[in-house]
Amino acid sequence: MITINQITDRKARGPKKKRKTLLTGYPQKKGYCMRVYETKPKKPNSAIRKVAKVTIKLKNKRKNLIAYIPGFGPHNLQPLSTVLVKGGRCQDLPGVKYRLVRKHYDFLAAERFVRKNRRSKFSVKNLETKAKKGKAVRIE
C-alpha cells in the first residue's frame, strides 16, 4: 500500500526522463578518431581491448564518445582517421556504448582469418556464390 508521504514525494520529483544517446535519430554517424588506445575490462574478465575516442558532429555541436574497435588482429586507425560509428555497448568496458564499423572510410583493416559461413553486415557482396542446378553463377 502506498502512503500519502510517498504520493507527495513522487509528485515533487516528477516523472523519470529517458536518457538520449548521441546517435538518437541516426543508425550510424560519421566521426573522427581523436585518440586510439587500449584498456582493460571489468573484474572477472582479463584482456586488452582496443578503443578509440571519437568526435562526431551533431547539428552545430561536436560531441566526444568512446567506441570499441571490433575484430581480431591489427587495425590501421590513427588520430584524425574517419570512421563510421554505430550503437552497441561493450559489456565489460565501462563507458563504452558505441562500436566502429569495419570496411568504411579509413577503417579498412580486414580480419586475419576468413569467415566462410557468414555474409558480412553492411552491404558487402558475397563473392563466392554456389552454383545452383543448371543456373549460371554471377560473381561480382
Swiss-Prot record:
Pfam families: Ribosom_S12_S23. It comes from Dictyostelium discoideum (Social amoeba). Keywords: Mitochondrion, Ribonucleoprotein, Ribosomal protein. PANTHER family: 30S RIBOSOMAL PROTEIN S12 FAMILY MEMBER. InterPro entries: NA-bd_OB-fold, Ribosomal_uS12, Ribosomal_uS12_bac. This is Small ribosomal subunit protein uS12m. One of its GO terms (biological process) is translation. The lineage of its organism: Eukaryota, Amoebozoa, Evosea, Eumycetozoa, Dictyostelia. GO terms for cellular component: mitochondrion; ribosome; small ribosomal subunit. The gene is mrps12. One of its GO terms (molecular function) is structural constituent of ribosome. Belongs to the universal ribosomal protein uS12 family. It is found in: Mitochondrion. PROSITE patterns: RIBOSOMAL_S12. It comes from the Eukaryota.
